[in-house]
């Protein structure tokens, strides 16, 4: 028995668990955090932030800003079409005005995050706090009172037992509690195979660094690429995220439709060539190879997010298509309000489920783009899809503003959301789309003055 004291327990010390620990410690709430230290050599997911994630990173973790890089654009490569969504708040005044009116702190950019350096620094910070009791281990069993919907006991791999006052399951795709408690799960996709890696600059070192590809137009963009069998030898959706001394590159492919491509090395070779064809030659700057990670996953949402004394935190409750940039944002939302579950779990669960379900429309839109036939995808459809994505993103941020910002900001957010839902306020042609030869697409999309469709 580690402790007779009944205190909160966090299972998992990835970003979700660490962020929750940080909040509990700030509230002087003693707790256990069970997991393992982050491995600074293993590539991670969740490096491209959406709006709310970027704001929360800046506000909750200001001391780690050396790991944040400006994200000024999202670029979609979809066959002959290339789409630019401009996110620089220093030049996009309408976007900046939205944040200001709804009560968010003023900030200039969305972010890419160096998760290797950030996670190591955050882990060091939380485990040094006297309110966090870190246990390097894993949970092997839980004793669950089904009638009371409460977790009574947690059993660790060394046989130790804890009697928690509350449990935050931050195990992400492992989904420890859902499997132990038999929580019904609705899968939102077929089985996916996600393959990703980091390519490093020869001078790479763990810690803050400047952007080694800074002179390239794509160095401050999340570049998303719809891969096709005809053009690239593989079907899926890929990403390229520059992060100072290294670049994060990967893809999510349908496991069944790409059965002929079995080697993770082969997948990365196809991916490297696909980006080079579009004018993004990241290997020119980042020549050093690292571990290639290959995992099978499905996107999902559980029937419920929590019970009387437990919560499926962030990615343990639901995961949607990665281009939404929502994974870390939901983790930080969970962390910001972590103490609310200790006071009123039923109310907190209801608000939480309502908020996270607002990401489902974005998942559906990304699914349309990813499953579409590139030959049939028109620029009008891309405008409709990207405008719908932005509309849903702004609606999510309005919902978030209602729970975290000033009363005036929350009121304006409620009004804006209502106008969008009534279709009295519409987002039209926010992104820019052009048709271009594949080898010229990257050059053309960043060239001012070209005629857009």
Please tell me what each predicted stretch does.
Residues 125-275:
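Predominantly flavin-linked oxidoreductase catalytic cores and closely associated redox partners
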Residues 37-90:
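N-terminal FAD cofactor-binding segment of flavoenzymes
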Residues 161, 236, 255-341, 346-347:
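FAD/FMN-dependent oxidoreductases across multiple families
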């Amino acid at each position: 028995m580690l402790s007779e004291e009944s205190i909160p327990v966090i299972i998992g010390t990835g970003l979700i668990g660490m962020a929750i620990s940080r909040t509990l410690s700030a509230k002087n709430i003693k707790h256990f955090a069970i997991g393992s230290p982050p491995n600074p050599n293993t590539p991670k997911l969740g490096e491209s932030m959406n709006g709310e994630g970027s704001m929360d990173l800046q506000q909750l973790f200001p001391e780690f800003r050396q790991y944040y890089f400006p994200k000024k654009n999202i670029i979609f490569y979809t066959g002959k079409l290339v789409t630019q969504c401009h996110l620089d708040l220093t030049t996009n005044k309408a976007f900046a005005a939205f944040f200001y009116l709804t009560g968010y702190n003023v900030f200039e950019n969305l972010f890419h995050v160096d998760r290797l350096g950030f996670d190591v620094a955050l882990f060091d910070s939380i485990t040094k706090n006297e309110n966090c009791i870190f246990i390097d281990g894993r949970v092997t069993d839980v004793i669950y009172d089904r009638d009371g919907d409460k977790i009574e006991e947690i059993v660790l791999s060394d046989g130790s037992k804890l009697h928690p006052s509350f449990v935050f399951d931050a195990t992400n795709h492992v989904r420890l509690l859902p499997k132990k408690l038999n929580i019904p799960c609705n899968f939102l996709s077929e089985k996916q195979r996600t393959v990703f890696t980091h390519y490093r600059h020869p001078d790479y070192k763990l810690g803050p660094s400047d952007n080694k590809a800074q002179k390239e137009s794509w160095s401050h963009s999340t570049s998303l690429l719809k891969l096709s069998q005809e053009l690239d030898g593989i079907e899926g959706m890929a990403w390229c995220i520059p992060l100072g001394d290294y670049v994060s590159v990967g893809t999510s492919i349908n496991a069944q439709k790409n059965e002929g491509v079995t080697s993770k090395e082969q997948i990365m070779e196809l991916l490297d060539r696909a980006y080079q064809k579009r004018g993004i030659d990241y290997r020119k700057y980042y020549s050093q190879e690292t571990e290639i990670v290959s995992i099978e996953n499905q996107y999902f949402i559980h029937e419920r997010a929590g019970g009387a004394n437990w919560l499926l935190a962030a990615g343990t409750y639901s995961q949607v298509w990665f281009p939404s940039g929502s994974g870390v944002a939901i983790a930080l939302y969970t962390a910001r309000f972590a103490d609310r579950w200790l006071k009123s779990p039923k109310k907190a669960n209801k608000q939480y489920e309502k908020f996270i379900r607002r990401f489902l429309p974005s998942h559906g839109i990304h699914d349309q783009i990813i499953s579409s036939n590139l030959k049939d995808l028109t620029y009008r459809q891309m405008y409709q899809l990207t405008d719908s994505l932005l509309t849903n993103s702004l609606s999510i941020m309005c919902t978030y503003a209602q729970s975290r910002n000033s009363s005036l900001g929350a009121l304006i957010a409620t009004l804006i959301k209502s106008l969008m839902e009534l279709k009295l306020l519409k987002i039209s042609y926010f992104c820019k789309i052009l048709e271009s030869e594949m080898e010229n697409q990257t050059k053309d999309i960043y060239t001012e003055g070209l005629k857009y469709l």
